[in-house]
Amino acid sequence: MIGKRAVLLCAFGSSDIKGIEESIGILKKDIEVHFNFRIKVEIAFTSKIIVSKLHKKGYAIRDLEGSLQQLHENGFEEVIIQPIYMMDGCENLKLREVVALYESYFSKLIIKRNLFGEEKDFNKKAINETAHIIKKYSEKYSNILIAGHGSKINDNSI
């Protein structure tokens, strides 16, 4: 018998509530629909400063540690963590360090790969899929800003 399962979408965070709802919130709903609402899907931010700002605005969200603790306390046995980082950089390393502290809490705790987690991912298909997503949203919104930043680790090879 399969125990209670959850997907935890993990990002650095944003203090823009509308931005959260129109990005990672949509992804959360899509995953819930995909699994016919049989799997709990939650969002966690790794930035404690962002989480604190959101709490002051009355927006309920947990940091990664709080989410893992809550899932454990609620009897979840299998948790899939999907980082919402483009590449395997510093934030992903921090995520792995935190997750390692909670491995014994669950029968299965898996961290999935980032969109461009490995060099083999820098291929035409992945780039075309990313371009398709941008095109889809450009039909609804007149302006789209794509932003990113570098990393001090070697995976910053894009």
Annotate the PLM regions.
Residues 1-158:
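Extended amphipathic ligand-handling, pore-lining, and cofactor/metal-binding catalytic surfaces
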